Structures are given as C-alpha cells and as structure tokens.
Amino acid sequence: METASAVHVGRPTIEGAIARYARAFDFLEVIAEPGRHPRRPGLLEWRRLVPERFVFSVVVPSAMSALEHRPDRPELLSHARMVADAVAADWWLVRTPPSVTPSARATRELGALIGDLRDERRIAWEPRGLWNDEEARRTAEQLGVYLVRDLAREERTDDRPIVYTRLRALGEGARIGAAAAERVAARLADSSDCYVTVEGAGAGRVRQVLREMAGIPQDDREAKDDEQRVFGDDEETFDDEDEESGGEFDEEESHLEDE
C-alpha cells in the first residue's frame, strides 16, 4: 500500500470526554439532530479539545435524508449548519433509509438536498436498501458525492483517491477482526485520503492495521479495543449540562434509545 496522506479512523458514537476519545481515534460522526449532540458551546469546546487533524463528519438529520417534504426543513438545515460550523466539519454525511429506492424522482430529490448542503465541505452518501452497485455508483457520480460502502465486505466500485467507508457490525458482540482490517487496507491501496467509521468492536485494530500498511509511523494514540464502549447504532441523548462541560456526559445521566 502506498503511503496515504491521511488515514482517519473512528467510531459512530462516543461516551464521555471528547479529549479521551481523541487520544484513541481521529474521526467522529456527529448526528445533527437536537438531543443527539452537545449544544453549540459544547460543540465549540469539542473542536478546541481535539487535535487539528481530527476530522468531524456531520450526519444530516434523518427527516431530511428520508427526502420527506416537511415544513420545518429550513430549520433542520439551519440546525445542521450550526453543528457543522461549530465543529468545523470536513464532511456532510447523507444516509438515505431503505424507503428511498432507485428512481428518477429519488435522484432529483436527493440532488436537491445535496444542492442545499453544498458548501466547502465534502459530501458523502450512504444508501441503505435496494440500491445495487451500479445504480449507487452512477447516482453518486451524477450528484458529485462520495459513495459510502462497507469495504470489509464489498469491493470498491470507483478509483477515486478519497474514500469514506463504514465497516458495519452485524450481530451482538460483532468484531472487525485482523483479516477484515487487512481486506480494507488492500481495497484502500490506491487512495490518498481514507475516512473509516468502525461499528462494533475492533476499531483500534483497524486503525493500527491501516496505518501500518500505509507506512505511517505508530503513535501513542493507538486504541485498545476496550478503551471506548461501543454503542453501534444506538442513540445518545445529551442534556443541558453538556453545554457547560464541552460535550462530556455521564452514562448515568444519559439514556439510549433505539433508532
């Protein structure tokens, strides 16, 4: 694998202090829905407490990604922009649900959403549901966005130098093992910038393998698998105290809800 200019690995959620998370990982998705992140002062503190190379990706509200016609769409977009600006996000992530299926109408509506989001940030699209490889690749190319795939299980469908991938955990206690991490590294061989979200356990191993195969020296931020608790797709709810704590929250004062 040729030396990559950037390899960013993280988990979809965190528990506790952002500074502790940033000692192990350098990539984080933030869901831009009220109650799913600290308030603006806490988000600003998150940005202040992480290294400069730490990358945030802001997940577009599900009501927008579902391409629903809602009267509060301007407010949802404004809130998402506030989150992205506060953490100086590099990415927008649009995750369309299974209800969004391949059609000319879906492509038009998705294109309109992409147009609303378009700014200096890159935009990634993660389709869930009935999109085959060619349909997803063609739509992503048409809209000028980066297609999110699970490169532990799927081959790449393009040769773009910038890659955003989600390694999905299937089943309780699922772990991304060394063999899967090596497959991902091989599929990222020709990329220059890699952004990897790891569900389930094994994110620390994935980061180590990717950095080793990219020829990047190891550092003291290598993650142990037990350093962070894994929440998978569960939701974190932040209370008002997060505004004062820079996003740090106590497990006993938070609760998780299934999506």
Task: Outline where the language-model segments fall.
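Residues lining hydrophobic/aromatic ligand-binding pockets adjacent to catalytic sites
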Residues: 1-259
